[in-house]
Amino acid sequence: MKSVLVIGAGLAGAVIAWECAEAGLHVTVVEKQDRVGGNCHDYDNEYGEKISSDGPHLFHADENSFSVEWLSQFTNWVKYEHRVRAILSDGRTTPLPVNRTTLEDVFDVDLGTPGETRIFLSSIQDQSIETPKNSDEVFLKSVGEELADIFFRPYTLKHWGKPATEIEAAVGARIPVRTNRDDRYFTDNFQYLPEHGFTPIFEKVFSHPRINLVLNTEYDHKAAQFFDQVFLTGPIDAHYGYRFGRLPYRSVKFIEEEIDYTPSATTMNFTDDGEYTRF
């Protein structure tokens, strides 16, 4: 029987390990942490609340996609549509991504239709930019100077550790601008969360009889000689000892506090230049 080594017990590692095991291969999964799930790992706290160890992870996709079909082998689903609001300087909150309501809140205008919204957007957008060279130019081209200052420039600096002018355009281009009042963060037709969280999915995957899971173990390059195939799913720069330099991952510090407050959306963004990014 052919043998496969998978480095990392996160989402990519789980898919590779399961598919190889289902194909009749013997699979060993090596994970340096003491838990499965990678960044999707979650757990229940003392109050029965689901806590995401490395920040919330949401699932949104086309309902006919392979990812929905594959994950549905291991979980039932609970409907969840994510919403984000930004805290303005006067304490009010407004939807993100920018939509018609956001424009009305910031500029104190009344935009009755998508057509009126498009006309208003064109009046504040930087029309001189044809092909944005960085994320800052993406923001200027899509929402103009004032909204770039309010929502994106300070937040990007906190989030990435460098200004939007130094971040490639593809990053900023991920953020949509809407002419309707849809305040959902995503528009996919399948927006759900696993009924019991993400961790039970991984536990089911790695319980496959042809998968051997080894936790608390760093990958040793010498081990590759004992396997027919090796799959790396962790940070590739770390795998090569950073000898080609470090890749620019964004960094977020998570602080857990209990406060008596009910937010108006699941995620509240601090888009100013203060210490925090969101809660």
Language model features with spans:
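Dinucleotide-binding Rossmann-like beta1-alpha1 core, especially the glycine-rich loop
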Residues: 47-126
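Short aromatic-enriched loop/helix-cap "lid" or pocket-rim segments at secondary-structure transitions
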Residues: 40-43, 98-99, 227, 244-245
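Mid-domain catalytic core of redox enzymes
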Residues: 23, 217-279
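Short glycine/proline- and charge-enriched loop/turn segments
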Residues: 44-53, 182-186
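N-terminal Rossmann-like FAD-binding beta1-loop-alpha1 element of flavoenzymes
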Residues: 2-29
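Glycine-rich FAD pyrophosphate-binding loop
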Residues: 21-46
